Amino acid sequence: MNLGSINENDFKESKAVAIAKNIIEENRCFKTFCEMDKRPNLDGHMSFIYKNQERMIIEVQIKTLPQNYCLSKSRVSKYYYDCDTKVFNVVKENVSLNPVSLILVDTYNKKVFCILLTRQYVAELHVNGKTTKRIYFNDSDEFNND
């Protein structure tokens, strides 16, 4: 019988989601993230609050960074991640009318990086039929009050 199961990746995801929740809430945003979800492509959403009112909802996909995500000799980007292309296709195919963000979590250093996936950003990735795509990011993508 084909029944869903809990695997090692579910435990890694749970840790990443917990870190993301804490850091995002410290920055005065509400979030609804799902752990061990089987909803394809997205893990939940963040609500940005301004003057005690919800002003924007952003759909999110959360990924755990590997321990070795630093680039050693790059002038342009400091970090990289080989990402499943499903979240990029969500943007490309207009699956959600809300903006979509990729949340990358460094569980070792407890850092959260946030990349807004605009249609232009996704188009420039040239995902086409690929199942993974390497993306690059920097310290400026770290989630903070700015």
Whereabouts are the PLM-identified features?
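Mixed-charge (Asp/Glu-Lys/Arg
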Residues: M1-P40, M46-D146
